């Protein structure tokens, strides 16, 4: 069987196409009708050759599918592509609005801000609006509204940004800190207690859970380690005395520890576990 039937070209053409495939089928049918011997004495070899020709034909057709668009692009590169590039700005008049929508969606999902908030008097939010619009960078190029609506929107978004960055309101921090010092014997709130704390603080359950994880590592564990090293001071009163000594930026708040917790006070007013 002639292998040229597998990759025959169209008669008078340079590129293989479906027309050549039909012509090959016609030539093969004529060969069958003429009863010319195209099979050998080895059936396995004949079957292998037929399958190989079919596979090669499939690959040749797939290559042709990928080659035809490339030829068209090369032919029209000097003319059509340049015209399309010149018409691009006119066909996309709402590109800045689309960039603004993209930025707002990513801000709501907690992504990193690429632009700085614009001033209330109006102006571009990015450092160079012209460069960002020419290069297509995803910076916020919208002009701030001169009315008070833009200021109100910025004020509404500020608490959400603070929560996403892990900066909780002082009121919420004081509530969770009070619960922590009131439950020093077991500083692990249950799911119901987490829900109640989230409702009282205005935070999410995940934020409350993360705060207690950090508090047990930054507050409780250092006190336990220090008490193990020092062990100085008188024993804590079973009735429970005001506890102080750990403050960050919040006002000092005194709490009473449960009677089951062994504590000690040193001369500097710091309290520790026994």
Curated annotation (Swiss-Prot):
Family: Belongs to the TALE/MEIS homeobox family.
Name the UniProt record assigns to this protein: Putative homeobox protein Meis3-like 1
Region (Disordered) residue spans: 108-167, 228-248
Residue ranges the UniProt entry marks as DNA-binding: 161-223
Localization terms from the record: Nucleus
GO biological process: angiogenesis; animal organ morphogenesis; brain development; embryonic pattern specification; eye development; hemopoiesis; positive regulation of cell population proliferation; positive regulation of transcription by RNA polymerase II
MEIS N-terminal domain segment(s): 12-65
Lineage: Eukaryota, Metazoa, Chordata, Craniata, Vertebrata
Keyword entries, A-Z: DNA-binding, Homeobox, Nucleus
One GO CC term on file: nucleus
Annotated coiled-coil segments of the chain: none
One Gene Ontology molecular-function label: DNA-binding transcription activator activity, RNA polymerase II-specific
Keyword Ribonucleoprotein: no
Bias (Polar residues) ranges: 123-135
């Amino acid at each position: 069987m002639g292998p040229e039937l597998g990759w025959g070209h169209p008669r008078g053409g340079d590129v293989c196409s479906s027309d050549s495939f039909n012509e090959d089928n016609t030539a093969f049918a004529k060969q069958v009708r003429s009863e010319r011997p195209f099979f050998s004495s080895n059936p396995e070899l004949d079957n292998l050759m037929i399958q190989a020709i079919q596979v090669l034909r499939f690959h040749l057709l797939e290559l042709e599918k990928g080659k035809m668009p490339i030829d068209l692009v090369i032919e029209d590169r000097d003319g059509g592509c340049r015209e399309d590039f010149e018409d691009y700005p006119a066909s996309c008049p709402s590109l800045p609005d689309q960039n603004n929508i993209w930025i707002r969606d990513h801000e709501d999902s907690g992504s990193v801000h690429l632009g700085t908030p614009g001033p209330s008097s109006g102006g571009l939010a990015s450092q160079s609006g012209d460069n960002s619009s020419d290069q297509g960078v995803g910076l916020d190029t919208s002009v701030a509204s001169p009315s008070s609506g833009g200021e109100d929107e910025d004020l509404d978004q500020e608490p959400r940004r603070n929560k996403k960055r892990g900066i909780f309101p002082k009121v919420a921090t004081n509530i969770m800190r009070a619960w922590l010092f009131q439950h020093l014997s077991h500083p692990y709130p249950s799911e119901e207690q987490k829900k109640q704390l989230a409702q009282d603080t205005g935070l999410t359950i995940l934020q409350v859970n993360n705060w207690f994880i950090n508090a047990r590592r930054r507050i409780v564990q250092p006190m336990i380690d220090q008490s193990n090293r020092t062990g100085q001071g008188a024993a804590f009163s079973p009735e429970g005395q005001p506890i102080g000594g750990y403050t960050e930026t919040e006002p000092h708040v005194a709490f009473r520890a449960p009677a089951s917790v062994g504590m000690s006070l040193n001369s500097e007013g710091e309290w520790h576990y026994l």
